[in-house]
């Protein structure tokens, strides 16, 4: 094996953000490529990131023919797993001898389904840097594949799962991501949400056990992983790179690639207060101009950080868009989804601090909706909660129990999945069957009503943001207004022009096919 092609295939667009903001840098690809290049320098490796380059399926086929790789790899989440499958089919049509390797959140869990139904030769399960290097070595040296930990494959029709690979203890030992193989200038060049963005991570894993989240289970300690047989046993694990290593990565993307907006992929950015403090000190010493960042933060830790003076440093160092997982408004609901319990008073205090002391930041909270036990009253209470804590943007997301979450296992057991097409697991479409008689369309209308009540019934909210004295916050409010109007207009025009039939509220939220998709 001499040449490897890693691909993010073409895909549909989120309708409620512009195309430039749709495609953030897929960090897994340069991480895998960097490790292969570091350990196996004789291997030629290329990355084809189709969406930001507007490479459609016809063009991708030409590229694969021209490159003639020995191995094609892709990793996907449930929402886009069908695009990876199409890639593997295309690669095998062009060259039946090509080795296809799948990874990422979906394929790591859905082993039997993937190997039995799709043209996949190997699955690299979960954390992939060490596994892919060892797999390539084993193939090239014709070693016994069963000795490679963390893979799944077929041998004479039988599916083989090798033992889980131990987690990488020291993330600093990993090679730097191969940003030079990515089209760095193409990520959000005209973005409203994340202009000149780059995706980075300083940690892997989480300390919480939310039953709707696949991030902590993916990066956790895997004890039982055969979810297709109902087996799931994972222990949360949290690891972080050193401050020095993280500052080195930021130096590269800022100085070499002029990336000014960091999207932190960490499930929880502010777990370790000492790390955060030292990191912000290092970043402030660099005095980078116009550097901003977006991060998932825990509310209780944010309160801790404020009392220690760390939150102030975070804002000075570039924190512009804190996103807090509020999720639900009552203790009973939080316990049902196995999330750490925040009291309403604690969450309100945190958002009040952000509003009064750091008015330049855009305060966002996420709320999960359309759970089986939801009633009209329980969902409308989330709007009251959002008003109570006075945030800039409440994201009301219908829950999508993807493979690898404990909620998915529970839903399978209770036959609670109303929608089984993973192409609709987009956190905008209701998925789970209601215990209280709601149809999926009724759930969708109710979820839309939450947005209407927060936005349309409170016009001062939108006007306050549109004329904010802070450029970044003002831009986000204009983005919100423009894209809401655009989404509604395009949805109506599709129906008027006969491009599709009216699908109700859910139809406005579906992913849209870009013009370059087939080209």
Q: For each of these PLM feature ranges, what is it?
A:
Residues 3-6, 18, 41-44, 61, ...:
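Radical SAM enzyme core and accessory elements
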Residues 93-102, 290-292, 360-364:
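Short beta-strand/loop segments at the ligand-binding rim of alpha/beta enzyme cores
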Residues 177-362, 384:
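Radical SAM [4Fe-4S] cluster-binding motif and immediate context
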Residues 22-36:
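Short catalytic helix/loop segments, enriched in acidic residues and glycine
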Residues 10-13, 148, 154-202, 226:
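N-terminal [4Fe-4S]-dependent radical SAM core
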Residues 52, 296-302, 325-338, 351-378, ...:
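Conserved strand-turn element in the central/C-terminal portion of the radical SAM core barrel
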Residues 35-39, 44-170, 397-404:
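Glycine-rich beta-alpha loop elements in corrinoid/cobalamin-binding modules
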Residues 113-116, 372-388:
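Catalytic cores of alpha/beta
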